[in-house]
Each structure stands twice: as C-alpha cells, then as structure tokens.
Regions:
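Hydrophobic alpha-helical segments
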Residues: 1-176
Length: 176
C-alpha cells in the first residue's frame, strides 16, 4: 500500500507524521470519496513528487475516475487561486475592485462531482497553500452546504498531516 510506502520512507525524527498518516484512513466523518479526494488533493498541493505518486496510486483504489480527476483539478485550480487571492489579501483591498480575469470553470462545475465534495478538496488544498481568504470562503460554503465542524476539522487535519509528511519525505530525500 502506498501510505505504507510513505510511512516506511519517513525518517525516525518524523515519527509523529508516521502515526498521523496511518490514522487518516480511519477518519469516519468523511465519505470514502471525500476522504481520499482530500488526501489526493492535498498530496498534490505539497508538490513533492514521491508523496504525490504514492498517494495517487492508492487513491485510485478508492475513487472513481471522475472523483480522482476532480481532486487533482481542485489542487490545480486552487494552486492558481490561492496565489491570486492570498496576494490580493496582502494588498489590503486595494485591488478588490479589479476582476480576476482567470478562467475557473472547474469550480462552477465542481469537477463533475457533488459540490460539497469539491469544496472539501478546495478547502484542504487552500490550507496547504496558506490562503486565509480561500480557506474562509470554502469553509463558509461548506457550512452552507451542511458540512459539520468535525468534517471541516478533519479536512484541516488531512492538510496538516500531508504537509508534515511531505516535509519529512523531502528532508529524507535531500539528506539521504
């Protein structure tokens, strides 16, 4: 299993990440699609090749082709949006009257899956990418769509865990 491969590759100083990663598949507040889509989207957002490959391999066992593509689409579109809106946030509203002029159709179509699920992926990726504007916007939409606080918290936990795992793997690969 690919999560097991990542766990084995983590150095001893990343034991906490090892244990946190092993607990992710046991999250019960999310459906299988929500869980594995969020895991895949956040892995993609880390930009660490080995993490993306290992998680993508395992995620294919749990997701339909449409959900798999939606998770990767969420990582891609939020990679753009997080930079755009985080930067505008730095500028304290000075450019809020300007149009983004960025194509974002995948968001309107929810990647072909349920809106709630796509929003979950977008929130988790935004957490990895550190965009407070996008985290707040997607959390608001999730709550309007009926997501529970436990679900939102678990999405943040997934993002934090994959971010920490990616850091540990990157260090192990760099230092040997």
């Amino acid at each position: 299993m690919s999560i097991d491969n990542l766990r084995s590759a983590l150095p001893s100083y990343a034991k906490d990440m090892n244990l946190n990663l092993s607990s992710l598949p046991r999250i019960t507040s999310l459906s299988e699609q929500q869980l594995w889509g969020a895991i895949l989207a956040t892995a993609a957002a880390t930009k660490v090749d080995s993490v993306v490959v290992e998680i993508a391999t395992e995620a294919k066992e749990h997701l339909s082709d449409t959900a798999y593509e939606a998770a990767l689409g969420a990582a891609s579109i939020m990679g753009m949006n997080n930079i755009f809106y985080r930067t505008r946030g730095f500028l304290n509203g000075a450019y809020d009257d300007q149009r983004a002029n960025l194509r974002m159709q995948i968001i309107g179509k929810n990647g072909g899956i349920e809106k709630l699920d796509f929003e979950m992926f977008a929130l988790a990726v935004s957490a990895v990418n550190g965009c407070s504007h996008c985290v707040e916007a997607h959390e608001h939409t999730l709550r309007e769509e009926g997501a529970t606080k436990e679900q939102v918290n678990d999405l943040i936990r997934i993002a934090a865990t994959l971010g920490g795992v990616a850091q540990g793997i990157q260090l192990a690969e760099a230092l040997g």
